[in-house]
């Protein structure tokens, strides 16, 4: 018999859906039924998301200054509120949990108005707009990187970390083994489409600037856009070095486990994964993020000593070559960075988040939860 229904709400992008998915698995293990509220973008995840049912509720973001567009968005939000209220009244969930993105606004507002326990999870080091709008209304805030003491809502914030997928937990069992002079050096480079495009242009040039003794040590895994495959593969072939170049790697967790250095963007999931595994990183925040969330995520890991942060505007091929030269000749420094990253990781985030959900569903206060958490 189910302990009750937990209604999860998440925007339709992977950054919102993946932590919700990790929590859903944990809650189902504990005997709860799980439903998901999202938008049509999440239909691609429907096959593997462990929900009894996935519900699409109307929602919209108010980002335009056009009065007609604003009126249309407000009407959509009002319609979503009505639909979410009916859904909650029908399902009778024990709690509603939001993971950010504008589709979370109607169900979380409806829950607070109906007196249903509610909480949000913020993946980044700074709150997104949807979560910021909901923060004053919910009973609790779980944070991937939000500090408990210095957050905007310290009395109801718990730093749980970001839940990571099982493959990452398995990869975390692999200890970091430094690469000494003369030994192979595994470099993993990846980022979203914008990051992949930038790295595709900068990295081959940077590698061409390395001394031959360093270049022959490199073993590169690089994620590139399909349209850049031919160009990057050609550059790498001319450099006569070992490289795997592809738009997507199904075994990225294993490749991260073998990495001696990672160069990547600093989305919340990425930073969480490399810290759980414990690998040194050069983080290049996406420069056009609305809330500068990637810069804040990167700064959080850099503060522990587990990463070096470089703005994209400063990351020339010459700079990359200088960094590679320095770290490939200093395995001890990379080992210290790996250890620092590992200490910052939160491999038990999904369990802690599930504990928090159960506590809020039982109408316990955050103060009580903090006193009794593991």
Swiss-Prot record:
Role: Cell wall formation. Catalyzes the transfer of a GlcNAc subunit on undecaprenyl-pyrophosphoryl-MurNAc-pentapeptide (lipid intermediate I) to form undecaprenyl-pyrophosphoryl-MurNAc-(pentapeptide)GlcNAc (lipid intermediate II).
Disulphide bridges, residue numbers: none
PANTHER family: GLYCOSYLTRANSFERASE, UDP-N-ACETYLGLUCOSAMINE--N-ACETYLMURAMYL-(PENTAPEPTIDE) PYROPHOSPHORYL-UNDECAPRENOL N-ACETYLGLUCOSAMINE TRANSFERASE 1
Subcellular location: Cell inner membrane
Highest taxon above the source species: Bacteria
Listed HAMAP family: MurG
Membrane-topology annotation of the record: Peripheral membrane protein
This protein's UniProt keywords: Cell cycle, Cell division, Cell inner membrane, Cell membrane, Cell shape, Cell wall biogenesis/degradation, Glycosyltransferase, Membrane, Peptidoglycan synthesis, Transferase
Pathway assigned in UniProt: Cell wall biogenesis; peptidoglycan biosynthesis
Protein name: UDP-N-acetylglucosamine--N-acetylmuramyl-(pentapeptide) pyrophosphoryl-undecaprenol N-acetylglucosamine transferase
Annotated family: Belongs to the glycosyltransferase 28 family. MurG subfamily.
Residues annotated as transmembrane: none
Organism this protein belongs to: Rhizobium johnstonii (strain DSM 114642 / LMG 32736 / 3841) (Rhizobium leguminosarum bv. viciae)
């Amino acid at each position: 018999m189910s302990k009750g229904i937990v209604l999860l709400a998440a925007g339709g992008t992977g950054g919102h859906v993946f932590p919700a998915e990790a929590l859903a698995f944990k809650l189902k293990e504990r005997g709860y039924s799980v439903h998901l509220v999202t938008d049509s973008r999440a239909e691609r995840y429907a096959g593997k998301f462990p929900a009894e049912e996935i519900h699409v509720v109307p929602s919209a973001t108010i980002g335009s200054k056009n009065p007609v567009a604003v009126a249309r968005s407000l009407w959509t939000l009002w319609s979503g509120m009505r639909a979410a209220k009916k859904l909650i009244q029908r399902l009778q969930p024990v709690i509603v949990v939001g993971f950010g993105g504008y589709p979370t606004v109607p169900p979380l507002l409806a829950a607070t108005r109906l007196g249903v326990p509610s909480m949000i999870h913020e993946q980044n080091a700074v709150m997104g707009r949807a979560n910021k709008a909901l923060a004053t209304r919910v009973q609790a805030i779980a944070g991937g990187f939000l500090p408990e003491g210095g957050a905007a809502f310290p009395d109801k914030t718990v730093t749980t970390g970001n839940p990571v997928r099982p493959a990452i937990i398995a990869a975390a069992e692999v200890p970091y083994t430094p690469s000494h002079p003369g030994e192979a050096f595994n470099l993993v480079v990846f980022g979203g489409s914008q990051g992949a495009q930038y790295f595709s242009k900068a990295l081959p040039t940077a590698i061409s600037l390395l001394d031959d003794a360093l270049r022959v040590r490199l073993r590169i895994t690089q994620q590139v856009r399909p349209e850049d495959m031919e160009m990057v593969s050609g550059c790498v072939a001319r450099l006569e070095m070992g490289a795997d170049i592809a738009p997507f790697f199904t075994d990225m967790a294993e490749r991260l486990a073998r990495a001696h250095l990672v160069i990547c963007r600093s989305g919340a999931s990425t930073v969480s994964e490399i810290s759980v595994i414990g690998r040194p990183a050069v983080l290049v925040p996406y420069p056009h993020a609305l809330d500068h969330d990637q810069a804040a995520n990167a700064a959080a890991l850099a503060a522990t000593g587990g990463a070096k942060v470089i703005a994209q505007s400063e990351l020339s091929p010459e700079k990359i070559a200088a960094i590679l030269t320095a770290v490939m000749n200093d395995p001890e420094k990379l080992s210290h960075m790996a250890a620092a990253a590992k200490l910052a990781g939160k491999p038990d985030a999904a369990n802690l988040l599930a504990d928090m959900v159960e506590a809020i569903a039982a109408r316990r206060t955050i103060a009580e939860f903090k006193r009794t958490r593991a």
